[in-house]
Amino acid sequence: MQSRVLLVTALLVLLASARATEGEDPSLLGLMQGYVQHATKTAQDTLTTMREFPVAQQARDWVTGRFSSLKDYWSTLTGKFSGFWDSTFAVTPTPASEAK
């Protein structure tokens, strides 16, 4: 009889602890959501602050200038090669077509 009472008591304790664990999950989820929202806001604030620094503006201007220079170089290079390819693949009459 005592073993049955002990078994029932153990099952009730397990059931009660399972219920207690279920109660903690939503609060843990809420805690994690709050943490993620706080981290997101902090990151956005930091990026906004970084955009306001003169050094960041200088870096953006430098990158924009270098990218523009690279685009100019690329268009010059492709212009030279496109002329080369156009002249190479020009249609030249073959001796058989001249004989007709």
Swiss-Prot record:
GO terms for biological process: cholesterol efflux; cholesterol homeostasis; chylomicron remnant clearance; G protein-coupled receptor signaling pathway; high-density lipoprotein particle remodeling; lipoprotein metabolic process; negative regulation of cholesterol import; negative regulation of fatty acid biosynthetic process. Residues 1-20 form the signal peptide. Residues 68-99 are annotated as: Lipid-binding. This is Apolipoprotein C-III. The most abundant glycoforms are characterized by an O-linked disaccharide galactose linked to N-acetylgalactosamine (Gal-GalNAc), further modified with up to 3 sialic acid residues. Less abundant glycoforms are characterized by more complex and fucosylated glycan moieties. O-glycosylated on Thr-94 with a core 1 or possibly core 8 glycan. PANTHER family: APOLIPOPROTEIN C-III (PTHR14225:SF0). GO terms for molecular function: high-density lipoprotein particle receptor binding; lipase inhibitor activity; phospholipid binding. It comes from Panthera tigris altaica.
